[in-house]
Amino acid sequence: MNTQTRETTSMSDAQDKAATLIEALPWIQRFAGTTMVIKYGGNAMVNDELRRAFAEDIVFLHHVGIHPVVVHGGGPQINSMLGRLGIESEFKGGLRVTTPEAMDVVRMVLTGQVGRELVGLINSHGPYAVGMSGEDGGLLRAVRTGTVVDGEDVDLGLVGEVVGVDPAGIVDILDAGRIPVISTVAPEIVDGGDSVPGAARFQPTGQVLNVNADTAAAAVASALGASKLVILTDVEGLYANWPDKSSLISSLTASELRDMLPRLESGMIPKMAACLKAIDEGVERAHIVDGRLAHSMLLETFTTAGIGTQVVPDEETNA
């Protein structure tokens, strides 16, 4: 006769897992039926184990009744492809200059490589994900932007800022029970001036722009009335006194972030500005989460303590 026994340690582990599930229950109940926008980026995009874990997290959100919308960039993959094609990357003030030649690569990599791979990973769990880009169905609209270096205006080429979102295409995919996966390129529009009435004032140029995935995700979250914006990055969260790791901020209000923003490290400014924009435009919560940790998004969303940094409206200081 075969006898099976369970060690005390394994039973303790099982009880810990049960406790984690019970802890998640009120958060699942709270966010079921809401839309969550997740910006996918950083190391989570290039590490195979983390990529698989991210896809599992998205499918988990889907199955507990949350409507995930994934927005992604692809900086590492773009750099790799430009190198393989012998196209030199130019940077001004730390920002990439996107030439027409480089823009062709950006579109190819974001929509044809990164987006397709992520859709495939999610769909390995079932027919859930649908890929789209900011060009599809007039989803995103952008204006060309530059930057200032040492007091001088600098042209960054085909780089833009999202100024409009038509969420109808995303809503159609969500209503069909699917998961939208959005790559961040956007058609360029120009302002015809006050003399042009109504919607005709903003005209497409036929050009496509490379847009920042953090700010694009914030714009999409605002347009959808999302309950959460989650930005995956390569740090644990926002620090009050970087690089002091003990100064990690677990939660702060929009006003507190607004005061801190000018003093932040340059790499964190676009991410935290995106969080602030989302909160200012009605998103309930915005989170910065360490994408180097597998399943970090679930830990931040479904545990009481969380592991990253959340930004909340001024009138609500408690999570």
Curated annotation (Swiss-Prot):
One of its GO terms (cellular component) is cytoplasm. Pathway: Amino-acid biosynthesis; L-arginine biosynthesis; N(2)-acetyl-L-ornithine from L-glutamate: step 2/4. It comes from the Bacteria. Keywords: Amino-acid biosynthesis, Arginine biosynthesis, ATP-binding, Cytoplasm, Kinase, Nucleotide-binding, Transferase. Its EC number is 2.7.2.8. GO terms for biological process: arginine biosynthetic process via ornithine; L-arginine biosynthetic process. Coiled coil: none annotated. It is an enzyme of class 2 (transferase). It holds the Pfam family AA_kinase. It catalyses: N-acetyl-L-glutamate + ATP = N-acetyl-L-glutamyl 5-phosphate + ADP. Belongs to the acetylglutamate kinase family. ArgB subfamily. Catalyzes the ATP-dependent phosphorylation of N-acetyl-L-glutamate. HAMAP family: ArgB. This is Acetylglutamate kinase. It comes from Pseudarthrobacter chlorophenolicus (strain ATCC 700700 / DSM 12829 / CIP 107037 / JCM 12360 / KCTC 9906 / NCIMB 13794 / A6) (Arthrobacter chlorophenolicus). The lineage of its organism: Bacteria, Bacillati, Actinomycetota, Actinomycetes, Micrococcales. The gene is argB.
